[in-house]
Amino acid sequence: MEKIHDQNIFFLKELFEDQYFDWIYYKQPITFNFFRSGGGTHLYLIENANRKYVARINYYEPKNAWGVKKQEYDVLKFIEPLKISPKAYYFSNNNSIKQDLTIVEYIEGEILGDISDKHIFDLATDLNKLHKTYQFDRTGDTLPPQDSSPYRCTIYNEFANGEDKKIEKYLSWEDINKIIEPYNRINKKLGDWFNNLRIFDNLTKFCLCHADLKKENILTTDKGIMLIDWECAGSDIPETDIGRLFSGCEFSERQQDIFLKAYYGNIPDEIILQRIIFIKKVLDFFYILEDYIILKRKTWNPDKMLKELLGYEKQMDGRA
């Protein structure tokens, strides 16, 4: 891995020598250092004249084909006037390292930890601003969006079909066998239920959504909340963003109520609430896998994971 980082830093140094960027002060030193990795992206901190930038370079090969760095760059340019995200400075999908990359503003801040009421109000304000400012008559992950009608909420399929969400991928994990059957059983039951809901029928108004709202992508700063990692952004119904937020940040019912009143001005119609809660329900299931295996937020313990899965199934059977 160290060899890859050396290669990427060498590439960045050459890039800044070969090209002139008007946002760089070339009379001052430019330093490049590995920052961290995650989500198929290596991050490198670039420092120059008291300013900082982040180079975001793919390392998971399929991300190049998906075009997520181009989408992120386009979206960040598009929403720059809102001042809720980093500025985008550079994009490349044709280079010597054969990996798509962006260079964006480095935001001084901390990943969202304990969630205060002010954080919730700030999130509601930022998302309301995003959703109301950029509205579309189609969905899709390009700008402008190009998906055909009628609308279908594909959030279950998006997660269930992900390579990293297949439990068989983790057969080498100790005692994984006790997880496989219940995970697949609940997964199928969840898909059969969610994909036959009628509450998503006949929707024709959509908006720009972040589409990956979780604590890791939310920074608290001196100027308020900032949203980072916009690779998944696209046009969808706002309920998808809110459901992702509630699940990804593990909002309590009280915190959900505070957000809904701040975002909508009051508690919204029942059908809107159902869309949000049912989307959250889908994500809650897949986040169990993320917690124990993919992102390792929790220490691997198959018995505890099984207990969470069975508890989830019991709740789902009572609600579905």
Question: Model-derived features: where do they sit?
Answer:
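Short, flexible/disordered intra-domain loops and linkers
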Residues: 4, 61-67, 297-303
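An alpha-helical support segment within catalytic cores of ATP-dependent transferases
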Residues: 8-26, 132-211, 311-319
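Conserved N-terminal boundary motif of the eukaryotic protein kinase catalytic domain
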Residues: 25-34
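ATP-binding pocket architecture of kinase catalytic cores
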Residues: 33-150, 154
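Active-site acidic catalytic loop and adjacent metal/ATP-binding pocket
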Residues: 36-47, 54-55, 188-240
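A glycine-centered beta->alpha junction motif in the catalytic cores
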Residues: 59-60, 101-114, 132, 161-170, ...
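Activation segment
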Residues: 60, 109, 225, 233-235, ...
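Active-site activation/catalytic loop segments of kinase-like enzymes and analogous catalytic loops
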Residues: 239-268, 281-300, 307-315
